[in-house]
Curated annotation (Swiss-Prot):
Quaternary context: Part of the 50S ribosomal subunit.
Gene Ontology molecular function: rRNA binding; structural constituent of ribosome
Entry protein name: Large ribosomal subunit protein uL24
Transmembrane segments: none
Function: One of two assembly initiator proteins, it binds directly to the 5'-end of the 23S rRNA, where it nucleates assembly of the 50S subunit. One of the proteins that surrounds the polypeptide exit tunnel on the outside of the subunit.
Name of the gene this protein is made from: rplX
Length: 105
């Protein structure tokens, strides 16, 4: 099944500590997404001189389940659900469920 959320989409987070934050999807891994500047965690890394890693506390974005984000509708500025519409030539098109407006051309 095709994913409703793709890399580069503007999304809003529905639940969790970052509820309400908006950001761009950096990566999609199956049913999880990584959103820029959201769900930031701290990782303690050991120094590795061979790889040029200094070590210490590193902050990075952790993944969020795809069901906890909605795509932002540019017309309304709100997060909305997305569905699919099959065109006559057989292509699938992502559309907003509220308005039926096409997401990608």
């Amino acid at each position: 099944m095709a994913n409703r959320i793709k890399k580069g989409d503007q999304v809003v987070i529905n639940t969790g500590k970052d509820k309400g934050k908006q950001g761009e999807v950096v990566r999609v891994d199956g049913d999880r997404v990584i959103v820029s500047n959201a769900n930031v965690i701290k990782r303690h890394t050991k120094p590795n001189p061979q790889a040029g890693v200094a070590g210490g506390v590193v902050e990075r974005e952790a993944s969020i389940h795809i069901s906890n984000v909605n795509i932002v509708n540019p017309a309304t500025g709100k997060g909305e659900r997305v569905g699919f519409k099959v065109l006559e030539d057989g292509r699938k098109l992502r559309v907003f469920r509220s308005s039926g407006e096409a997401l990608d051309a």
